[in-house]
Amino acid sequence: MEIQLFKRSGEEVSFDADKILLAIEKANQATQENRQISEDKITEITNRVIQKCNEIARSISVEEIQDLVENELMAEGAYTVAHNYITYRYERALVRKAN
């Protein structure tokens, strides 16, 4: 089943798992090297998020997907990466609110 995503604009689009992978990679790159997670772990986390999205029998919002990413990072014990992901998410929300 193809996952549908509700963007913040209200537009419904096809889910793009590469965006999750890229977001986690960026948070990982912003993390001190000794606290980073491996590319394999990033892929595993991305796959778990995709699986959880597939289990939801409806279109899912960007915020819900971001919550799933945060939860999976924390479940993996990647607290510093999760912190960077959450911080970036918060900063982007502030920018959107200011516009």
Where are these regions (language model features)?
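Extended catalytic cores of very large enzyme megasubunits
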Residues: 1-99
